[in-house]
């Protein structure tokens, strides 16, 4: 197996306690490729958005991953704030693939619904979740992000 060492300038920080490592094998990329997780729970085919292909694409997977993680962060923050969440909190995630002068990039919107929660309290929960969620941390300062309370 070939590995690429990161330069000293871009070394990864070591986690205090490793909780989980996701493993996936991908071939072919978005143009007819496929991916499968090591445990087999996710097994997908890729296709380019806007083509007749029936596969998913990296942007859809990113939207699903981030919204699922962010919803867990919302639940954690609400619990710490001792706020009871509704039974049906939801996130509609939108991830755009863009192409500009600097090449390809992403931008994202997480449209969060917390029915029945006071608007100021809900906004505090979202702010805390955005500071807690690993996806939010990974994208902070790297892509345009909007977290909207709807």
Q: What are these model-predicted stretches?
A:
Residues 2-64, 71-150:
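Extended beta-strand/beta-hairpin segments
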